Structure formats: structure tokens, C-alpha cells
């Protein structure tokens, strides 16, 4: 199914959307990030979907909220900037507000991608103004004095930073400077003071600057969104799902008719490809419930063992076809080779491509893993329906395979997240409704 045609092919009831004036383009560096920002609008009644891959232009996408996965998390700064410039040229139509989704812990190339966004908007409408607020308080990410904290501790001390970081520190102005961007800190006192709108208006008037905003609570993000939305015609936003929820909350909410789908007797495929400790712990908890069969797979199998991959596919297909849920987990040691990520995702997609006809619902942790599998299953988009918990989006895949799907960034959630995801997907596929 073409993504642009989904509205006529999915039963959403007879409601006609009374859309607010804003339309949005969300450009993310991975799939889970694209989804958890888009659902901020989708859960408030805006038609929202995620797509990726080859998209010539946005002329056929009449959605008020379109999110695109640029798949740039693993690229160099120069390559990520080129990819974003190309995406923006094709998809950033006049009238759409740009939301540049970045990782809340600064993985990937957020500075280079932000520079590409500034350059694109400047070429189209003159000096641009960026509002940079990466905080996502619901997942423990805050920003104080222009620096990111994770659960109250400096980002530089967090597991995710030790495992993977691009910059020398987590100071937002320093990060922006690596791409030649002028940043100005807007500290918490200014966010909570009475002159925030004037501060943003001043910076927008200067142009070609990014306001790096503190935020400790969801209300702080609301204040930032409210004061900056109309700061200038060339204002754009840089942040994570926390800021997306704040911006979506400014719009009039509409009653949401739940998506309805045929019921399925096939089981749920749950794939854990993320290295984050949160996902690994959640996998152990889910396995302990006895509601899934655990299929651990070694990196060597995915890289070099064709017979092992075929055996994995046969076992997983048998489980799913019988109505049972399957938990497939890439097993890694304490010192994984991060450079193998794309190869492992491809190997897993090679192994599981054949099980697609037996899938009743699908969940994946880690954007790279999810994107590789979905592309191999013939999926070209996701129509978003709900949010299971902060950072966990629920929707319906579009393309050759149409099943309920949940996506989760690897480091989000707690030890019970996969249990909640499994239970929700089971309910959706057996009831035929996303309620």
C-alpha cells in the first residue's frame, strides 16, 4: 500500500478531521525517533505517519504530520548533512513547520544536521531561527545550564555516552559550535521568567542563531513551545519527543477514532537489537513471564552461519504460526563491536524475512534493527495510532505487510516495558482494534 493512499485503505470511522493550521515535517536520524515524535501529534487526533527510503517529493503526502527517517545516525557529520539537505529539498514544503528530531543523548550528528536545516531554511526564507530543547523529562532527560542530564547526572557519566558519543562534552552551545552554528543559552530562569517570548523574538530578529534551552519539566517545554512557535516565519525546532509533545499540546485536540483491523491468530514477533541495558533487562523480565519463547541469536550466526539463520527462521515461524509470541534477541558481550551494528541488522533481516507471513504483530527495540526488518518485510511506512508509554509508539505497518507495530528506542523504558508492549500488541491483534 502506498503511504500517500493509506487514509482510504484503513478504517478510521467516519470522523472528518478539523485540522489546526499547522502542518509538520519531522526529520529524524532513526526510525524510533521519527515515530515517537510523530505520535505526539497523532495521539491528539492529527493524522500522522512515518516513512523512509525513496521519496521523490511530498506532493502526494497530504498528512498534517509527516515524519521521515533519514537513517543518518551512523553517518559521518559531512554525510549526515548532505543526506538531510537532500531530504529537506524534497520534503520541506512551504507551510510545513520543520521539527529536526535529534537523539536526547546527542548520539549521531545533530549539529551537522541542524546546520543543514539552517542553511535550507535560509535559502528559502531568509535568516532562520532554531529552538533547541532536547529534554525529555518523561524518560529522565533534562537540560540545566545548557548541559544534558540523565536522571539527574551529567550525560557524560551515562551508559549511553560511554558506549557511543560524537562530541567531547554535552554542552549544547559547544555541540552546535562543532558545525559552525552560533548558539545562545536560554537558562531555566529565563524559561520560567516573564520575558521568554521577547527573548525568542530578539534572537529570531538576529537570525541564523539557535536558542539552546534549559528544561527540567514538561511544563518548561510547554513554556518554550508556546513562546517560540511564532517567533519568526523561519523558526524551526530541534529536540526529542519531549518538545514534540509540548508543541502538539498547543493545538486543539480532536477525538481519535481507533484504527480497526482484521483479527489475527498469529503470534507477535518481538526483536531486541539494542545494546542498551534497559532493553536487555526488559527482555529478561519478558522471558520470565513464560508468555514468549526466547530465541537468542549470536552475532556469529547472523554474520557467517547461513544454516543457523535458516534454522532460526524455521523455529520462529513455527512459533508464530501456532499463535505464540517469539522474542528474538541478538546476544552481545559487555564489550560489543559497535561497527558491526549495520551488518547485524542486515543479518537478522536476512534470517527473518521468511517469517513475515506468520507475523500477527511486531515490536522492535532499536531504530536500526526495526528499519532493516521492516524494509525486508516490504513495509514502507507506519500509520501511527497511540503511545503505549513515553517513547513507545503504536501503529499499523503499511505496504506488503499490514500488522500492529510497536517501536521503542533501546534506552527508553523500564524493566517492564516489553511486558506492556507484548500485552498491548496481543490485545490489538486479537480484538482487531487499537483501543
Indicate where each model-derived feature is located.
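Short acidic, glycine/serine/threonine-rich loops at helix termini
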Residues: 37-39, 109-113, 141-149, 198, ...
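Glycine-rich, highly charged phosphate/nucleotide-binding loops
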Residues: 54-55, 76-89, 344
Amino acid at each position: 500500500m502506498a503511504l500517500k493512499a493509506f487514509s482510504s485503505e484503513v478504517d478510521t470511522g467516519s470522523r472528518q478531521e478539523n485540522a489546526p493550521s499547522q502542518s509538520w515535517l519531522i526529520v529524524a536520524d532513526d526510525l524510533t525517533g521519527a515515530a515517537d515524535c510523530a505520535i505526539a501529534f497523532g495521539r491528539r487526533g492529527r493524522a500522522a505517519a512515518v516513512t523512509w527510503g525513496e521519496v521523490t517529493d511530498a506532493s502526494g503526502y497530504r498528512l498534517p504530520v509527516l515524519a521521515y527517517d533519514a537513517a543518518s545516525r551512523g553517518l559521518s557529520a559531512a554525510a549526515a548533512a548532505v543526506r538531510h539537505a537532500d531530504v529537506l529539498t524534497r520534503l520541506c514544503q512551504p507551510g510545513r513547520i520543520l521539527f529536526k528530531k535529534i537523539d536526547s543523548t546527542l548520539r549521531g550528528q545533530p549539529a551537522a544536521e541542524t546546520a543543514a536545516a539552517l542553511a535550507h531554511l535560509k535559502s528559502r526564507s531568509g535568516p532562520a531561527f532554531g529552538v533547541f530543547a532536547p529534554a525529555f523529562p518523561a524518560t529522565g532527560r533534562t537540560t540545566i545550564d545548557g548541559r544534558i542530564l540523565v536522571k539527574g547526572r551529567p550525560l557524560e557519566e551515562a551508559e549511553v555516552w560511554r558506549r557511543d558519543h560524537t562530541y567531547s562534552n554535552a554542552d549544547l552551545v559547544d555541540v552546535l559550535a562543532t558545525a559552525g552554528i552560533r548558539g545562545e543559552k536560554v537558562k531555566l530562569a529565563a524559561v520560567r521568567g516573564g520575558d521568554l517570548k521577547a527573548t525568542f523574538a530578539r534572537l529570531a530578529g538576529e537570525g541564523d542563531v539557535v536558542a539552546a534551552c534549559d528544561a527540567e519539566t514538561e511544563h518548561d517545554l510547554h513554556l518554550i513551545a508556546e513562546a517560540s512557535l511564532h517567533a519568526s516565519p523561519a523558526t524551526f525546532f530541534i529536540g526529542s519527543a519531549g518538545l514534540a509533545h509540548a508543541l502538539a499540546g498547543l493545538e486543539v485536540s480532536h477525538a481519535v477514532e481507533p484504527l480497526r483491523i482484521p483479527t489475527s491468530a498469529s503470534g507477535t514477533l518481538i526483536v531486541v537489537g539494542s545494546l542498551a541495558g534497559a532493553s536487555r533487562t526488559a527482555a529478561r523480565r519478558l522471558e520470565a513471564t513464560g508468555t514468549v519463547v526466547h530465541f537468542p541469536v549470536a552475532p556469529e550466526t547472523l554474520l557467517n552461519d547461513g544454516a543457523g539463520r535458516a534454522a532460526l527462521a524455521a523455529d520462529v515461524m513455527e512459533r508464530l504460526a501456532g499463535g505464540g509470541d517469539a522474542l528474538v534477541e541478538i546476544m552481545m558481550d559487555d564489550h560489543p563491536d559497535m561497527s558491526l551494528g549495520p551488518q547485524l541488522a542486515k543479518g537478522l533481516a536476512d534470517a527473518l524475512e521468511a517469517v513475515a507471513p506468520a507475523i500477527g504483530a511486531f515490536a522492535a527495540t532499536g531504530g536500526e534493527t526495526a528499519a532493516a526488518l521492516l524494509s525486508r518485510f516490504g513495509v514502507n511506512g507506519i500509520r501511527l495510532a497511540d503511545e503505549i508509554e513515553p517513547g513507545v509508539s503504536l501503529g499499523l505497518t503499511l505496504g506488503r505487510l499490514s500488522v500492529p507495530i510497536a517501536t521503542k528506542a533501546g534506552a527508553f523504558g523500564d524493566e517492564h516495558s516489553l511486558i506492556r508492549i507484548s500485552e498491548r500488541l496481543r490485545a490489538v491483534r486479537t480484538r482487531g482494534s487499537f483501543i
